[in-house]
A protein has these predicted regions:
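Outer-membrane beta-barrel domain signature, especially the mid-to-C-terminal portions
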Residues: 10, 14-35, 66-70, 109, ...
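Outer-envelope beta-barrel architecture signal
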Residues: 36, 47-49, 140, 162-166, ...
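Membrane-embedded beta-strand positions in outer-membrane beta-barrel channels/transporters
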Residues: 39-41, 146-150, 211-213
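Outer-membrane beta-barrel pore domains and translocons
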Residues: 45, 56-58, 171-175, 217
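Repeated loop/turn-to-beta-strand initiation elements of outer-membrane beta-barrel proteins
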Residues: 48-53, 156-157
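Membrane-embedded beta-strand positions of outer-membrane beta-barrel proteins
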Residues: 53, 168-170, 214
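Extracytoplasmic gating/loop element in the C-terminal half of outer-membrane beta-barrel translocons
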Residues: 60-162, 167
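C-terminal beta-signal and terminal closure region of outer-membrane beta-barrel proteins
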Residues: 76, 88, 93-100, 105-110, ...
Length: 218
């Protein structure tokens, strides 16, 4: 995909319009493969109660978001509105104190001071004026994948019934994305409801699942 142009490791900004200078030469800007994955599973018990949880961790990997690629250009996400560093609406014309100041340097290495226009679909963050790398995110995450709370009936009750063990459990899955870097969506989301990795378009919000379980042993 397309990348930024760099000077001494800093992203270059066009001083005439405040936008990124795009390096149009196709190059590798990400890798869908994570550096590693891990899980933490633990169970805490007290008398007849047991609380177990599973935390999933992924470190590394990248995902390209077509949702922000087009979304930033259409002005849907929150970061395309609000106030800029001058306290003025981002979407006001630059001549009236609006616009956004992108982090980077001029081609000569001096600090960028030119604000980029955000008043139309042709803004500095959307598909027309930002490189693919701007919409490529770190796919790392930490998730509370599952929590289970179980209660085992005491023997004094079970002895009156034709069972050797009875337990009831409440289960929750995908309860909390503790940490992530991909904006507006689950890092594991793919193309719509599909499971394509490393590419998001029309990503459907992740859902929390709740269940109830009864276990009977004879």
């Amino acid at each position: 995909g397309t990348n930024y142009t760099f000077v001494n490791g800093e992203r270059v900004i066009n001083p005439d319009n405040g936008r990124f200078v795009i390096d149009g030469t196709p190059q590798v800007i990400g890798d869908i493969n994570p550096d590693w994955k891990a899980g933490i599973n633990n169970t805490l018990s007290y008398k007849n109660l047991a609380l177990s949880f599973l935390i999933d961790i992924q470190e590394g990997g990248n995902v390209f978001s077509l949702d922000t690629w087009y979304g930033f250009g259409t002005g849907v996400p929150a970061n395309t509105a609000g106030l800029n560093g001058l306290g003025n609406p981002l979407r006001d014309p630059v001549a009236d104190g609006g616009g956004i100041l992108l982090e980077g340097v001029n081609p000569d290495g001096s600090q960028n001071t030119a604000r980029a226009d955000m008043s139309t679909y042709d803004n500095a963050l959307g598909w027309r004026n930002s490189p693919n790398a701007f919409h490529t995110y770190d796919a790392s995450y930490v998730k509370l994948r599952e929590v289970t709370l179980s209660y085992t009936l005491p023997k004094t009750i079970i002895d009156r019934l034709p069972f050797t063990d009875i337990s009831v459990s409440a289960i929750g899955r995908n309860l909390w994305i503790i940490d992530k870097h991909v904006p507006y969506s689950d890092p594991e989301a793919g193309l719509s409801s599909g499971n394509i990795q490393g590419y998001q378009s029309g990503a459907i919000p992740s859902t929390k699942d709740y269940g109830f379980n009864v276990r009977l042993q004879f």
